[in-house]
Amino acid sequence: MIIDVNSPLPGESINRAAPWTSYNSDYLIRVFGIIENFKGFPNTLGFFAANEVMNDLDTAEFNPQYIRAVQRDLKNYIAKHSTRTIPVGYSAADVREILQDTWAYMQCAHEDDHSSSDFFGLNSYVQADSSIALETYAYHICLM
């Protein structure tokens, strides 16, 4: 399992419109609780620090540093409270105008920097109607 530590309920995820309003101690207590509940299962492969927080140019302006801060906090918590290393990453929306920059920023690492993504997920949605060619949906571009 790769578990998203966030939920759609108010206060339980990064607010993409104003991330500074949601990244607080209550939020961290909640996400650390998710780690506590799943860290002991051998089939826990990783944790998503955030999922589709950036979905356009406007949300890509302020959110990246908050996502990396959550990744750092999760990794530090896991290092102190788990008997094993559990990877932490980001799950991105398939928004082509920001996708490459998002990937580059999330995976960029420096010495002693624990905020980079261990993995990068991509949510690519396709409406599959078998009577219509996949090229109509541009899905063939994702496969390249």
Residue ranges, per PLM feature:
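Noncatalytic carbohydrate-binding groove/subsite architecture in carbohydrate-active enzymes
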Residues: T59-M144
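Hydrophobic faces of well-ordered beta-strands that scaffold small-molecule active sites
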Residues: M1-V5, L45-A49, V88-Y90, D118-L122
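Active-site-adjacent "subsite" loops/lids of carbohydrate-active enzymes
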Residues: S7-E36
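Eukaryotic short linear interaction motifs
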Residues: L9-A18, N43, N55-L57, R96-L99, ...
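Extracytoplasmic/periplasmic, Sec-exported soluble proteins
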Residues: P19-D26, K39, T59-Y66
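Active-site groove signature of glycoside hydrolases
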Residues: F32-F62, G89-S91
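Solvent-exposed, polar/charged alpha-helical surfaces in well-ordered, non-transmembrane soluble domains
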Residues: I29-E36, P42, R68-R72, N76
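Acidic (Asp/Glu)-rich catalytic clusters
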Residues: M1-I2, G33-N43, M106-S115
